Amino acid sequence: DSYTGTGSGFALSSDGYIATCNHVTEDAKHIQVTGINGDFTRFYNAQVILSDPMTDLSVIKINDPEFKTLGEVNYDLRPDVPVEGEPCYAIGYPRADLLGDNVKVTNGIISAVNAGKAGPVFCQISVPVTYGNSGGPLIDGNGNVLGIISAGYGDKAGYMANLAVKASYLKLLLESDPVLRKLTFKPILVKRSLTEIVRQVKDNVYLIKVSNSEPESSKNNIVTDKSINSIPRPELQDNGNRVSVLYEVKEKH
């Protein structure tokens, strides 16, 4: 089937819940996930369960009779604020149309804990990311999720600033839902080599393909958005300018 965009996502539970970015899924009438258990020959239909445009977060769930399991989730969503200078790694599927559907890993540091006009939800990172990385996990030196890759900005002088949503905001989103708040994670407390981290995490990171039109072959299987929620938080109130700045950043990426 044809698709209009791609993104990345990562497992929240073995039974099919996946985190990604709202801007990846918000206009999609058809969402498919591939790369489950390393298999890119099979595509599974998914639906949006919960989303928050203010934090650019979305939770989807595989809704496909052929689906069995995502396997064990062996990482935590970090509840604390990242630290400037902290090493971090992006795992995802940038430009899958050109670079193929094997997972890509890039590294860098936390450049700033807050991302200026984009607001306290986001941290700035030096990790190279591009189209298709959106929704993928930003991993710390233990293999836990620090953030979710969201946006990037580049100017004519060559300055690049990439943004990730802090994982603590994903935890808040999950806690707003009576089902998702029951999800549990396994904190990894010991630092490991990058090769060990990638080996552990990569099978829980997936390629998401979206289409703005409903394909004829799947009309009976598509399920549209079940619920759209936004979390009320003091630091996110009256932030229309902040959100518009973020979307402007995305358009320039």
What are these model-predicted stretches?
Residues 1-32, 217-229, 252-253:
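Catalytic histidine site
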Residues 5, 56, 134:
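Beta-rich catalytic cores
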Residues 10-11, 128-149:
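Catalytic nucleophile loop of clan PA
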Residues 1, 28, 46, 64-70, ...:
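C-terminal cap/linker of serine protease catalytic domains
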Residues 54, 79-83, 104, 129-133, ...:
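Soluble non-cytosolic domains of exported or imported proteins
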Residues 2-3, 117, 127-131:
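Short loop/turn motifs at secondary-structure junctions and domain boundaries
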Residues 102-114:
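Short, compositionally biased
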Residues 13-100, 118-122, 178-191, 214-216:
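Conserved active-site neighborhood of the chymotrypsin/trypsin-like protease fold
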